[in-house]
Amino acid sequence: MDEYGYVYGYLPATEGMEDVTPLGLIAHLDTAPDFNGQNVKPQIIQGYNGEDVVLGTSGRVLAVKDFPRLKGYKGRTLITTDGTSLLGADDKAGIAEILTAVEDLMREKTPHGKICIAFTP
């Protein structure tokens, strides 16, 4: 960790993968001060139809034209906010996913290039 609160490190490339382009993974450490994680209102969409996602009655919409990757989740279950609160994970979920991915790579001995990791304040 540096004097500004940035945490960074790397997982070295496995043997024979040293020339592969490094992969960078980044997440922020802080949480949104405007939302305290109470009164979280998730919206669970079973069998997503591949169209725009209306976030409850908030007037907010996740439009497929703005988020074209949504179409790839057609038929799956989506969990979103109802538009009035954060889901409570903020980027703590991002940190957990990055650390889990690195742990999995180390445990399973999956061949990989250098993995660069950074967590920002």
What positions do the PLM features span?
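Active-site metal-coordination/substrate-binding segment of hydrolases
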Residues: E18-K109, K114, F119
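A non-catalytic alpha/beta surface segment that caps or lines the substrate-entry region
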Residues: M1-V20, D30
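Beta-rich nucleic-acid/ligand-interaction surfaces
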Residues: Y6-L11, K114-I115, F119-P121
